[in-house]
Amino acid sequence: MFIVSLLLLFSVLNVYSNSLDYFKSNFNYLKLSDAKSLPLQDKSTSSGNFVSHKKNNNMSVADNDDSFLYKNIQENKALNLENDLESKSAKDFFRFSAISIGSFPIVLFLSLFFFDVSYYFYSGMNANYVPYPFSNGPSFSKDEIYKKFIVSASIGAIVALTIALLDYFL
């Protein structure tokens, strides 16, 4: 606990010791005309560890819809990789891979949780095998942990690919 407190203290001191010019927002790489109208762009100055912001009160809150920075992000070719793909099969493969890779961590977490719950009920609700979020975790041997992870990862990969296939065919 003491080591964790020291790490937290040093990380906070490190953040406050760095100059805040490093964290200044820069929207030049987006090449969007609306980035210039952001209130803090090129208006923050720093001196040591102190930052001052000049207020820009002439920016209206209710602008027209085209001024929203991320409204047309899907149509912007610089930001959207899918627009660079020209064949339909390449776009379908890109979508399939994005959905399967994106859903895998969620499905892996759920399969690990349900594996723990099933092991708890299979062992006769033994207090040593209460699932992880409700206790310190079951006391498995290294071989059982390896088997649990392999089974859960296999189930997670199969379910993630099934979700991507369902999206492709539907």
UniProtKB/Swiss-Prot annotation:
GO cellular component terms, semicolon-separated: membrane
Keywords: Membrane, Transmembrane, Transmembrane helix
Membrane-spanning ranges: 96-116
Protein name per Swiss-Prot or TrEMBL: Uncharacterized protein BB_0019
Record carries keyword Membrane: yes
Lipid bilayer topology: Single-pass membrane protein
Cell location: Membrane
